[in-house]
Amino acid sequence: MGKPATKPAPKPSKQQDDKKSDLQQELVLQRLYDTVQSRRGTDPSLSHSARLMARGRNKIAQKFGEEAVECLIEAVNGNRKELIGESADVLYHLIVMWVDAGVSPEDVWTELKRREGTSGIAEKAARPKEKLG
């Protein structure tokens, strides 16, 4: 006697695929965050992340700004490959800034989820007004 025929597993829906993709992306950034966080306070001669954090928040912000500008330049120039690389640099330096400031990826995901489904104009209008100076 042969084995009974089994039905193939149902194909995941696009929504399930999207959720899986979102989770994988969050996990990549979480792993990078965990790696950067593990470098905090370690020997700056052995880790670029440790060296940045040892130099202080102003240097971290400067590096983030430099990478953001490079990213924008590549976007404006239409250099897709370079834009991808510079985008990765921006994300890395953003995560270094998060670690230094005590912000976790979960803090940011929570804020993004709170904003989900709200129009950008309505969300921005609902923010408290900040005074400069």
From Swiss-Prot:
The keyword ATP-binding applies. Keywords: Amino-acid biosynthesis, ATP-binding, Cytoplasm, Histidine biosynthesis, Hydrolase, Nucleotide-binding. The keyword Zinc does not apply. Pathway: Amino-acid biosynthesis; L-histidine biosynthesis; L-histidine from 5-phospho-alpha-D-ribose 1-diphosphate: step 2/9. Residues 1-22 are annotated as: Disordered. SUPFAM superfamilies: all-alpha NTP pyrophosphatases. It comes from the Bacteria. One of its GO terms (biological process) is L-histidine biosynthetic process. It catalyses: 1-(5-phospho-beta-D-ribosyl)-ATP + H2O = 1-(5-phospho-beta-D-ribosyl)-5'-AMP + diphosphate + H(+). It is found in: Cytoplasm. One of its GO terms (molecular function) is phosphoribosyl-ATP diphosphatase activity. Its EC number is 3.6.1.31. GO terms for cellular component: cytoplasm. Belongs to the PRA-PH family. This is Phosphoribosyl-ATP pyrophosphatase. It comes from Gluconobacter oxydans (strain 621H) (Gluconobacter suboxydans). The lineage of its organism: Bacteria, Pseudomonadati, Pseudomonadota, Alphaproteobacteria, Acetobacterales.
